[in-house]
């Protein structure tokens, strides 16, 4: 059963994200002293008493300005109200009542859901009552003086809020595949997200840096549940100003760590850039499965050989993630977007796959028969005793050897390539752990192994 939703509405910079973090007891929403930080609507799980719900943080509402993002933000706020059971209208107790507050209040009075009025920045309990009193004239009922920073008054607000939430039975945990959508700014991540789920969930604009938060969307396909995380575009550090974009990029890196599969989006018009290569390395370092999505394929002039030539070029630039599957799509037209989910399923399955010790050692035996470990200058040869998979997500194989130093990097790559050739693991990195072990210890453990090389 889906959680009931609470929408947070208000002017820019009244402290909506601070309140979201307070209610959700987290710091997921970006908080920075700059208007317009939150542009998309972002979802956080929250609890009060015995109730669980989702808090939706929306962008700052401005009705008398149609500059670039503002109409899109209004559209997002309206979408949040449509799906919400109750809304919290946040105003600034220190600034006092403004014309912008009155415009929003007039708009909210036309909505069909309950509205609670939260007067934020009332850090002083005694002065807070006076600050809140001026907002009675908005005609939205009793104003609650609260402090998003310190938490003053939020208990009373939540006590009232949960009375408006629909009754709900026991919430069951669903198995979700967590997918981070990452890439450089303006490669079409939000457009892909919207095309994938069939609604305008994230703001889409030709200006780089539109998405600043990491945004979660839960969707179901063919009986499976997916959590999609649309992240801020990642660019070179020297091009990143300290502030909201800096926090957003760090949130994107955190999203990669949260995910199981990374949907790595590349702009077909730009090809693979140096920053794309660095981002791919980040995915490998964090040990995440990956699907390479080449977007804007509709904008490329093609002949019968274009897709083959282009894939070869991308592969040559991203040779270190040769294990990732690739798909060419257009978020604008929707072409092939529906096929991405099959690649994600394959990558997720391989990411958590386990292989028996006997099969691993059969691969090792075959590999060693074709290419035995090298011998060093002192005439000492490396010896692989046996291997076993110690964990998944990503698949990690421990190789017990006489001395790890006797296995140079080129031979380690050879062994890894043999595992890929025989075991697959398409879409996921493989980690090999080279562990030194004395021959006597190996003999003692032989009885516990299915096969010995």
Swiss-Prot record:
Q: Which UniProt keywords apply?
A: GTP-binding, Nucleotide-binding, Repeat, Ribosome biogenesis
Which family does the entry's similarity section mention? Belongs to the TRAFAC class TrmE-Era-EngA-EngB-Septin-like GTPase superfamily. EngA (Der) GTPase family.
Gene behind this chain?
der
PROSITE patterns per record: G_ENGA
HAMAP family named among the record's database cross-references: GTPase_Der
The organism is Trichodesmium erythraeum (strain IMS101)
Start and end of every EngA-type G domain? 4-169, 177-352
Stated name of the protein: GTPase Der
Q: Which GO terms describe its molecular function?
A: ATP hydrolysis activity; GTP binding; ribosome binding
Q: Does the keyword field hold Ligase?
A: no
- What does this gene product do? GTPase that plays an essential role in the late steps of ribosome biogenesis.
Q: Where is the KH-like domain?
A: 353-438
Question: Is-annotated flag, keyword Methyltransferase?
Answer: no
């Amino acid at each position: 059963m889906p959680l009931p939703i609470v929408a947070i509405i208000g002017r820019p910079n009244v402290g909506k994200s601070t309140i979201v973090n307070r209610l959700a007891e987290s710091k997921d929403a970006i908080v920075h002293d700059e208007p317009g930080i939150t542009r998309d609507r972002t979802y956080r799980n929250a609890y009060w008493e015995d109730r669980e719900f989702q808090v939706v943080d929306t962008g700052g509402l401005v009705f008398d300005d149609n500059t670039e993002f503002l109409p899109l933000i209004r559209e997002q706020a309206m979408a949040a109200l449509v799906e919400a059971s109750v809304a919290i209208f946040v105003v600034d107790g220190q600034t006092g009542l403004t014309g912008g507050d009155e415009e929003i209040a007039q708009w909210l009075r036309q909505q069909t859901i309950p509205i609670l009025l939260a007067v934020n920045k009332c850090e002083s309990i005694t002065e807070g009552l006076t600050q809140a009193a001026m907002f009675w004239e908005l005609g939205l009922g009793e104003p609650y003086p609260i402090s998003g920073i310190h938490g003053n008054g939020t208990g009373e607000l939540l006590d009232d809020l949960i009375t408006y939430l629909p009754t709900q039975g026991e919430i069951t945990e669903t198995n979700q595949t967590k997918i981070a959508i990452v890439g450089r700014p303006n490669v079409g991540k939000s457009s892909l997200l919207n095309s994938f789920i069939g609604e305008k969930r994230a703001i889409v604009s030709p200006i780089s840096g539109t998405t600043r938060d990491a945004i979660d969307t839960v969707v179901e396909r063919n009986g499976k549940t997916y959590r999609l995380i649309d992240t801020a575009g990642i660019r070179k550090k020297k091009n990143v100003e300290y502030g909201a974009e800096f926090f957003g990029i760090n949130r994107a890196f955190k999203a990669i760590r949260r995910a199981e599969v990374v949907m790595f989006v590349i702009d077909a018009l730009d090809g693979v850039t140096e920053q794309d290569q660095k981002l791919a390395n980040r995915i490998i370092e964090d040990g995440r499965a990956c699907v390479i999505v080449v977007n804007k394929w509709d904008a490329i002039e093609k002949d019968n050989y274009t897709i083959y030539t282009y894939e070869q070029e991308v592969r040559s630039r991203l040779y270190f993630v040769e294990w990732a599957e690739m798909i060419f799509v257009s978020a604008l037209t929707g072409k092939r977007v529906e096929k991405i989910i099959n690649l994600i399923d394959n990558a997720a399955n391989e990411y958590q796959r386990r292989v028996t010790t006997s099969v691993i050692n059969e691969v090792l035996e075959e590999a060693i028969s074709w290419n035995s470990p090298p011998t060093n200058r002192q005439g000492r040869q490396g010896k692989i005793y046996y291997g076993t998979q110690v964990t998944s997500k990503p698949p990690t194989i421990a190789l017990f050897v006489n001395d790890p130093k006797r296995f140079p990097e080129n031979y380690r790559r050879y062994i890894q390539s043999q595992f890929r050739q025989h075991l697959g693991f398409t879409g996921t990195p493989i980690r090999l752990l080279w562990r030194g072990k004395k021959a006597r210890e190996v003999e003692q453990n032989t009885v516990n192994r299915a096969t010995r090389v």
